[in-house]
Amino acid sequence: MESILIVSGTRPEIIKLAPLYHELKRQPWARVVWLHTGQHAQMAEQIMGSFDIRPDLTLVRQGDSLLDFSLGCRAQLEAVLTGERWSTVVVQGDTESAFQGALAAFYNGVPVAHVEAGLRTYNLRRPFPEEGLRQMIGRITRFHFAPTARSRDALLSEGVSKQRIWVTGNTVVDAQQWACEHRGIHRRASGRGHMLVTMHRRENWGQDVEQVCRAIAQIARQHPELDVLFPVHLNPVVRGPVHELLADLPNVRLTAPFDYLEMQQALADAWIVLTDSGGLQEEAPTFGVPLLVLREETERPEALEAGCAGIVGTSTDAIVAHVNRLWNDPAEFRRMQRAGNPFGDGTASRQIVRHLAAELGVGHSSAVREQADVVA
């Protein structure tokens, strides 16, 4: 029996690790332990409940600052990892929880499995601190599960052996398929649908948020028949200017942040998405919804190459121009709508489990390794 520790801390990690957790739980050779670090304590219980997950271990968050959290998390993870023999530690993405989980595993000689490996902008300030964290995780990872060929190529360029990289697709698509099947997510809106807007990234705080809000206000006034749905981040740095500039517009609805299932339903009913979220760049194409990225660069260029997304930055004029182009050009809108999802087909979790089984010496390892070499 192989003991596998899954480390999660934030909403996106839970979403993307949930389908892998359920797939691992079905394996007779795996003992799976879900550990939650408490990084996003308020959101965790609800989102885990949405995926029928009850954590086996929950760390006690110490202090409010990132430094306090990191120190407390590291010490508690050390106790967990030294308490028994682990076959591998699974982390996802580029959060502080993922980094601390990977670092604790590395120090204790436990192989790290990194889900969503190889995303890069090579700009340590954008996104901050995620770009630095994922690069550091990449240096100490044994099993790199890259969502796309581009992510694999980034790892190869950094000197990672191709024998340690598997292109699996992104588990976020698996999670969406699970939600559609088990929670009844489907398009319910009639007509065009709404414009869905989200913003939360640290690099967009301040003037960038204000510019985006001015663009939304201009679009809402130009198109009074278009409903704008904006679940607003709780951080006052974001919440303040959003409410100041948009609260009085009759066709703009400002809400509290959505839970996962609410966001999936909002995506299914959307005409277009404006966001700085990485996760939504991966999710919107599943529902055939064009997306405009409110950033200057993205670590998910596959969406741009496929044609289902475009980068507009945070310039008021650029945002308004891009939205109006899609409003006035049905052919361009349909092209983006029909581009498909370049991030996977919903089988990523099954592929990851097969490859882990091969590397850990259980299951049909030779067949899996042969298939992995073909993919790589």
Task: Name these PLM-found stretches.
Residues 1-230, 236-376:
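Nucleotide-activated sugar donor-binding and catalytic core shared by glycosyltransferases
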